[in-house]
Amino acid sequence: FSFHHRTDWVNNTLSYGSGYASAFIEWASNVADTKFRFSEQAVRLLIDYYLDGICKQMVYGRISDPGILNRDITRPGEERVWSSSDPEKLRNLTDYRQAELDNIICLRKGDSSCRPGSFAKFFWRTDHFVFQRPDFYTSVRMYSTRNANMEEPYNGEGLMNHFRGDGTNYLSVRGDEYKRLTPVYDWMKIPGATIVQLDKMPGENEIQKWGLTDYVGAVTDGTYGAVGLDFKSPHTGL
């Protein structure tokens, strides 16, 4: 599961996509004991989206994967620990995948007795690959002819995001390694990306570009995986 707010198919799972889920979670919780309650099938779909879409694009299900941030990377607090409110509400709706919801709740509350799970997942519509073990989380952000590299700099945010989709590979052990990095970031030295070092960054109208190659692909059995990208920079031709 992934969420796309616009026709550029940029990954918005943890921005608009989380708000989308939260609205349904709130109403499912509000009407749970009435004749308007959501069907079990609908609740299960919502839980699947929350656990397999939202939580698996987060470091240990607690903190946003820095690799999927768009213009919101410039906002203070994006490295915060997410609230346990939504998974708690979901847990009260059904016993479906309850152990996994309990683990997310426990992790977000900072209980040291909880251990993050292990998984490898490819979000094929988003061209995003994630890999987690109990002691680290890493991801690879890519794009192809099917989607754009980055969100437009709406509201004057993310003005230096030109190269952040170019195979970016962030590694997190605690989850807060990139906290408050944005003001001092070298935007032409992005982890995992091969970037031509320019004299100055292109203008803000040159941030969003569509991929020039078709191939981004991965194989995974849910625990192990491999991912590949046929990359050609739409900014520099590299």
Indicate where each model-derived feature is located.
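Active-site lining segments of carbohydrate-active enzymes
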Residues: 1-37
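Extended polysaccharide-engagement surfaces of secreted carbohydrate-active enzymes
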Residues: 20, 27-238
